[in-house]
Curated annotation (Swiss-Prot):
GO molecular function per UniProt: coproporphyrinogen oxidase activity; metal ion binding; protein homodimerization activity
Residue ranges, annotated region (Important for dimerization): 248-283
PROSITE patterns for the chain: COPROGEN_OXIDASE
Protein name: Oxygen-dependent coproporphyrinogen-III oxidase
Length: 308
């Protein structure tokens, strides 16, 4: 099992380099991803041990902020967020390896994107380790372009259908349900794919699906960036983007499993919260004008079948 974990780690670290290189190619000023490598000390007082590399870009003309973060950690006991739906795993040791990214563009017409790909192994050093994959990618637009959502979902469906034709409808629905702010009765965006506890096939079959899914992120996102990054926008557009970013913050801090897992397990706070947008605003009881571009967003982000 350790060999398989290392193989996935090698894939993720190479993917991290590929994604940051491609994103930098679309940046138009001197902003670059900086690498922040870290290691948790292997001491008795540390609940979580391991290492990682958080790659951050800030202040770009295209990407106002972005993070592509790799980590490999292990602990003596899975935190509550990881065992809430699988009580049989409570108290078990674990290894977790993953890559998580969030890209916050400067232009309000370019959507924010998020992706995550990970593996968990409980009882990794025993004769019967329990493994599962998780991940997916989702899109959060501020102003609607139907063709962008169709392209995003078509890319997701193509990858899923290559492996299992039941995956796309199942993981698309899961994504719509997961990225939902209960207290706002709003979806975070137009969704995409979300899956967890993936071990319904052999390890190699699941590995191949997850790596194909991860490799398709750039195919899904970069054409949208290229199409929208030069659209002129006003301060009104920017203000609405900042307001909607507030929803992103609310979701990450209240509902996101990765954030909760990281904080509960004693993870590296700077890396865990690096996905936060550089700026966000909240307005008391604000409502968009009837018939405005801003009002259309609230209809656009409701779950729907994007692929006719």
């Amino acid at each position: 099992m350790q060999e398989k974990i290392s193989k996935f780690e090698d894939f993720l670290t190479q993917l991290q380099q590929n994604i940051t290189t491609v994103l930098e190619q679309h940046e138009t000023n001197a902003a670059k991803f900086i690498s922040d490598k870290w290691q948790k000390p292997d001491t008795p007082d540390q609940k979580l041990k391991g290492y990682g590399n958080s790659m951050i870009i800030e202040g770009g003309e295209i990407f106002e902020k972005g993070v592509v973060a790799f980590s490999r950690v292990h602990g003596s006991e899975l935190p509550p967020s990881a065992t809430a739906k699988r009580q049989e795993l409570a108290g078990k040791s674990f290894i977790a390896t993953g890559l998580s990214l969030v890209i916050h563009p400067r232009n309000p017409f370019v959507p924010t994107s998020h992706a995550n790909f990970r593996i968990f192994i409980a009882d990794a050093d025993t004769d019967n380790p329990i493994w599962w994959f998780g991940g997916g990618f989702d899109l959060t637009p501020y102003y609607p372009f139907e063709e962008d959502a169709i392209h995003w979902h078509q890319t997701a469906k193509n990858i899923c259908d290559k492996h299992d034709k039941t995956y796309y409808p199942k993981f698309k629905k899961w994504c719509d349900e997961y990225f939902y702010l209960k207290h706002r009765d709003e979806c975070r965006g137009v969704g995409g794919l979300f899956f967890d506890d993936l071990n319904d096939k052999s390890f190699d079959e699941c590995f191949n699906f997850v790596t194909d899914c991860a490799n398709s992120y750039l195919d899904a996102y970069i054409p949208i960036v290229a199409q929208r990054k030069n659209i002129e926008y006003s301060q009104k557009h920017k203000d609405f983007q900042l307001y909607r970013r507030g929803r992103y913050v609310e979701f990450n801090l209240v509902f996101d499993r990765g954030t909760i897992f990281g904080l509960q397990s004693g993870g590296r706070t700077e890396s865990i919260l690096s996905s936060m947008p550089p700026m966000a605003t909240w307005k008391y009881n604000w409502q968009p004008e009837l018939g405005s571009e801003e009002e259309k967003v609230y209809q656009y982000i409701k779950p729907r079948d994007w692929i006719k």
